[in-house]
């Protein structure tokens, strides 16, 4: 938490290793924490597991709590940010991928419905 700048947008990843590759990021490590910062300044980044009911439900819950949410493109073959790094992509490329796939509100719910496979 000491490396977070709460005056900037915050990225919240599912896994601690994933958070190491992003600017101003922390990890929930599978927990459903009640974050004490403005949810609208946070972007939740879950693993790319469209068949995982728990992840889909947590994504919907994050949108209901006014978090921004990354919904990975269907063409992405990797499970998480760490896998994307291993594939040879840079942190900057991942930041762009995240920016291009961040949604909120009804738009996020629509993207979740198109992404999920359950």
Task: Annotate each language-model stretch with its function.
Residues 1-2:
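Charged, flexible boundary elements
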Residues 6-10, 16-118:
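TOPRIM fold recognition
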């Amino acid at each position: 938490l000491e490396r977070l700048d709460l005056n900037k947008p915050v990225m919240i990843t599912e896994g601690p290793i994933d958070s190491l590759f992003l600017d101003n990021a922390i990890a929930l490590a599978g927990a459903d924490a009640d974050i004490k910062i403005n949810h609208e300044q946070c972007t939740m980044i879950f693993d790319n597991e469209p068949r995982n009911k728990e992840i889909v439900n947590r994504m919907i819950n994050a949108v209901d709590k006014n978090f921004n949410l990354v919904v990975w493109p269907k063409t992405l073959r990797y499970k998480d940010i760490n896998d994307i790094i291993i594939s040879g992509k840079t942190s900057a490329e991942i930041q762009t991928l995240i920016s291009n796939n961040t949604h909120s509100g009804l738009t996020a719910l629509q993207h979740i419905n198109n992404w999920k496979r359950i």
